[in-house]
């Protein structure tokens, strides 16, 4: 089970975004203390902590990922970004999963075989493999 943490102030403003309320700077600051509180509340029910957004401050998202791996190593860490690529200031090795790509309505979401979005999983050797196809229904995949 994944705990998805929405991060507001999204600069991407993708047309058709299902979370357009996150375009504004709303909510509470996401701190290491807040992460600890989430872990205390949901820790036995989750296996992954996912940051949904954070494109306006990728350095902080990276720092929070490092914190989780150091202080809560039992959890995987994921980041869903609307950017085309991971910013150079982010160390991809601090994440177990990374989704990149803006939402483009006519291409569809991650579950569509025509999507531009990609989900990557870090392998044991540190390389990342594209696992997007796992979200597609078999009948949607061209053979």
Task: Locate predicted features.
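Short, acidic Gly/Pro/Ser/Thr-rich loop/turn segments
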Residues: 12-15, 105, 127-128
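Canonical Radical SAM [4Fe-4S] cluster-binding loop centered on the CxxxCxxC motif
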Residues: 1-30
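Core AdoMet radical
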Residues: 19-31, 44-59, 74-87, 97-122
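P-loop/Walker A phosphate-binding loop and immediately adjacent motor/lid segment at beta-alpha junctions
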Residues: 58-65, 69, 108-143
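Residues that flank catalytic or metal-binding motifs in active/ligand-binding sites
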Residues: 1, 94, 115
